[in-house]
């Protein structure tokens, strides 16, 4: 009975580890991307930073418990964890940088346009004054 029960969890965890991260990383990547976009528009960064570690801790806890049952597939999860951390770190950072830079650029561009318009007006006024006198 030990061999049957021992072989089932190994195959189950292998199927789990192979099927779960692919589907989870895709859905999580989309969720974190959409959440970070929504939250960056609102301006609340604390929610995105608190949610990404929470969603990050859940799969590691689930994988570590399954890893304790069998040590042989324990060599495959660490690279997958690294990939998850890289994806989770990159996905929130990119949208926040883009969204943060856009309003600043817009403000800077608006300010530059205003100063250019003012400079043109001043030059026109100066030209008309010199011509009239």
Swiss-Prot record:
One of its GO terms (cellular component) is nucleolus. Transmembrane segments: none annotated. Zn(2+) binds at residues 12, 16, 24, 26. Residues 34-52, 61-72 have a biased composition (Low complexity). It holds the Pfam family TP2. The modification Phosphoserine is found at residue 133. A motif (Nuclear localization signal) lies at residues 111-119. It is found in: Nucleus; Nucleus, Nucleolus; Chromosome. The keyword DNA-binding applies. GO terms for biological process: acrosome reaction; penetration of zona pellucida; positive regulation of protein processing; sperm DNA condensation; spermatogenesis. GO terms for molecular function: DNA binding; zinc ion binding. Residues 1-26 have a biased composition (Polar residues). Residues 1-104, 114-133 are annotated as: Disordered. Keywords: Chromosome, Developmental protein, Differentiation, DNA-binding, Metal-binding, Nucleosome core, Nucleus, Phosphoprotein, Spermatogenesis, Zinc. The keyword Protein biosynthesis does not apply. Plays a key role in the replacement of histones to protamine in the elongating spermatids of mammals. In condensing spermatids, loaded onto the nucleosomes, where it promotes the recruitment and processing of protamines, which are responsible for histone eviction. Belongs to the nuclear transition protein 2 family. This is Nuclear transition protein 2. It comes from Pan troglodytes (Chimpanzee). The lineage of its organism: Eukaryota, Metazoa, Chordata, Craniata, Vertebrata. The gene is TNP2.
């Amino acid at each position: 009975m030990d061999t049957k029960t021992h072989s089932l969890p190994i195959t189950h965890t292998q199927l789990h580890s192979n099927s779960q991260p692919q589907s989870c990383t895709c859905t999580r990547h989309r969720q974190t991307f959409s959440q970070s976009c929504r939250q960056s528009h609102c301006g609340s960064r604390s929610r995105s930073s608190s949610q990404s570690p929470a969603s990050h801790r859940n799969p590691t806890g689930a994988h570590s418990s399954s890893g304790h049952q069998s040590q042989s597939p324990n060599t495959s999860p660490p690279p997958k964890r690294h990939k998850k951390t890289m994806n989770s770190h990159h996905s929130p950072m990119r949208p926040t940088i883009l969204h943060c830079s856009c309003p600043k650029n817009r403000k800077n561009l608006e300010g530059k346009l205003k100063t250019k318009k003012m400079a043109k007006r001043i030059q026109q006024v100066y030209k008309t004054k010199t011509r009239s006198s």
